[in-house]
């Protein structure tokens, strides 16, 4: 049996890190597509020349031709403009919807049997657009947001409590924006509720304030990176997050990862892509895990879904206009 094949659409910062991670983990042969002549070829050659040092054996190819993504097992899309300081993800919708339309047509023609992971912003709208244009089964077209948002939440908790990130369990639901829903009630350190640990450290009132600050920082974490970089947006952490999803599919790991999936009644949502916990395996999204939200969590989820609906509606008006 030959090696798996991963295609990366977009050769920018995230694409470069994705290619390197795929190679280092030997997930499969990698193709990087970008419209900029020479750029993907140069990046892939650079990574390939590190193979004797890093000790990986995979084929790396840069291209300007969608034909080269044929036979892909996984396609990861990062193409589109990144955010700049003062911009929201939603500000990118007009430009990036045009780019995504072209990308989706390429995937439809040459890689319609792949598992597709969208990273491009605004995420919830871009994954919706890609699925509509490709006509691919919804369980094989998803968005990467929740893995990253949850990772940020976990990191802030670990740093606050002075524990290993490996022992923190936490998750966000909803859209990839300022209305995402970090689930405080389920956050734990090796099974111990985070709120209990914060209350031991600070007392009940202060613990609530500290948790609220971490929740808000999680919601605004992407913008925090953008403000510091000044010329672009996060790329290391989004790439690592997408690789976790790709690896679960390529190796049939059946990991439970927060994934932007098309919902059909789950969590009371119909016909919209929203971040929820999903089992990712060889066939794509194999199952969405549902659980009861309390009144506060449900209200936050409803608000987040409303923001997603507004974004998708604005996408529809742009496409019609």
From Swiss-Prot:
Catalytic site positions: 176
Keywords: NAD, Oxidoreductase, Tricarboxylic acid cycle
Catalytic activity annotation: (S)-malate + NAD(+) = oxaloacetate + NADH + H(+)
Keyword Transcription in annotation: no
Disulfide feature: none
UniProt GO BP: lactate metabolic process; tricarboxylic acid cycle
Xref: InterPro entries: L-lactate/malate_DH, Lactate/malate_DH_C, Lactate/malate_DH_N, Lactate_DH/Glyco_Ohase_4_C, Malate_DH_type3, NAD(P)-bd_dom_sf
GO MF term set: L-lactate dehydrogenase activity; L-malate dehydrogenase (NAD+) activity
Keyword Mitochondrion: no
EC number, UniProt record: 1.1.1.37
Annotated NAD(+) binding sites: 10-15, 34, 96, 119-121
Matches recorded under Pfam families: Ldh_1_C, Ldh_1_N
PANTHER family referenced in this protein's UniProt entry, alphabetically: L-2-HYDROXYCARBOXYLATE DEHYDROGENASE (NAD(P)(+)) (PTHR43128), L-LACTATE DEHYDROGENASE (PTHR43128:SF16)
Family, similarity comment: Belongs to the LDH/MDH superfamily. MDH type 3 family.
Role: Catalyzes the reversible oxidation of malate to oxaloacetate.
Matches recorded under NCBIfam families: MalateDH_bact, PRK06223.1
Name under which the protein is recorded: Malate dehydrogenase
Species assigned in the record: Trichlorobacter lovleyi (strain ATCC BAA-1151 / DSM 17278 / SZ)
């Amino acid at each position: 049996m030959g090696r798996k094949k991963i295609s990366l659409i977009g050769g920018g910062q995230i694409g470069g890190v994705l290619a390197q991670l795929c190679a280092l983990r030997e997930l499969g042969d990698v193709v990087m597509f970008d419209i900029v002549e020479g750029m993907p070829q140069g990046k892939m050659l650079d990574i390939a020349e590190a193979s004797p040092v890093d000790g990986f054996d995979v084929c790396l190819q840069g291209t300007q031709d969608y034909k080269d993504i044929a036979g892909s097992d996984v396609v990861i899309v990062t193409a589109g403009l990144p955010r700049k300081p003062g911009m929201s993800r939603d500000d990118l919708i007009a430009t990036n919807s045009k780019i995504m339309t072209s990308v989706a047509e390429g995937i439809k023609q040459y890689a319609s049997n792949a598992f597709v992971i969208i990273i491009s912003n605004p995420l919830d709208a871009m994954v919706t657009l890609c699925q509509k244009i490709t006509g691919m089964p919804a369980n094989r077209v998803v968005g990467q947001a929740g893995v990253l948002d949850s990772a940020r939440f976990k990191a802030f908790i670990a740093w606050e409590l002075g524990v290993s990130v490996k022992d923190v369990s936490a998750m966000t639901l909803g859209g990839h924006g300022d209305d995402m829903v970090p689930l405080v009630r389920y956050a734990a350190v090796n099974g111990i509720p985070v709120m209990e640990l914060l209350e031991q450290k600070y007392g009940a009132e202060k613990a609530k304030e500290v948790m609220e600050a971490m929740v808000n920082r999680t919601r605004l974490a992407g913008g925090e990176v953008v403000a510091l970089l000044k010329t672009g947006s996060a790329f290391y952490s989004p790439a690592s997050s997408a690789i976790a999803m790709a690896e679960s599919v390529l190796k049939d790991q059946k990991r439970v990862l927060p994934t932007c999936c098309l919902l059909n009644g789950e969590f009371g949502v119909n016909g919209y892509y929203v971040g929820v916990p999903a089992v990712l395996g060889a066939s794509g999204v194999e199952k969405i895990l549902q659980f009861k939200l309390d009144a506060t969590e449900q209200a936050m989820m409803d608000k987040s879904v409303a923001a997603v609906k507004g974004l998708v509606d604005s996408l529809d008006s742009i496409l019609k206009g």
